[in-house]
Each structure stands twice: as C-alpha cells, then as structure tokens.
C-alpha cells in the first residue's frame, strides 16, 4: 500500500539523487519503492477500469428497447 511515508521517502531519495547522489543501498531502496509504487498504481487503475466496465455492462440491461438495432440486417 502507498503510504505518506513511502511517498516522502521516494521524494527524499529523488532530491538526494539530484543533489549529492545516492549510496548503493539507497539506489536499491529507491528502485524497490518505485516498483512497489508503480505496482500499486497499476492495481488501482485495473480496479477502476473493471468497475467502469461493470457499470457499462449493467447499463445495457436497464430496460431500453433494443429492437431498433435490427433494421441494419438485410433479409
């Protein structure tokens, strides 16, 4: 889970890397934190998309008359 501390730490490491540079340990930590962060964001996006997809599906069955689609078929 993304916490405030995690974001603060990512920012801290980023700024330190821009100013004085990071130790090997800090570089590893930064890489881990970023991977965790990206993974979490992707999960959130996936959940969002799924909930949107389900919302759209339920709309199709909300009682509208779909017979008007049939005039496109040639007999």
Swiss-Prot record:
Its main location: cytoplasm. One of its GO terms (cellular component) is cytoplasm. Keywords: Cytoplasm. Pfam families: DUF896. It is found in: Cytoplasm. Signal peptide: none annotated. Coiled coil: none annotated. Belongs to the UPF0291 family. This is UPF0291 protein Teth39_0326. The lineage of its organism: Bacteria, Bacillati, Bacillota, Clostridia, Thermoanaerobacterales.
């Amino acid at each position: 889970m993304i916490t405030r501390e995690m974001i603060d730490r990512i920012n801290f490491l980023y700024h330190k890397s821009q100013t004085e540079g990071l130790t090997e340990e800090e570089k590893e930590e930064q890489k881990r934190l970023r991977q965790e962060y990206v993974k979490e964001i992707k999960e959130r996006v996936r959940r969002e998309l799924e909930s949107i997809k389900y919302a759209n599906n339920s709309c199709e069955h909300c009682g509208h008359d779909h017979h008007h689609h049939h005039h496109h078929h040639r007999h």
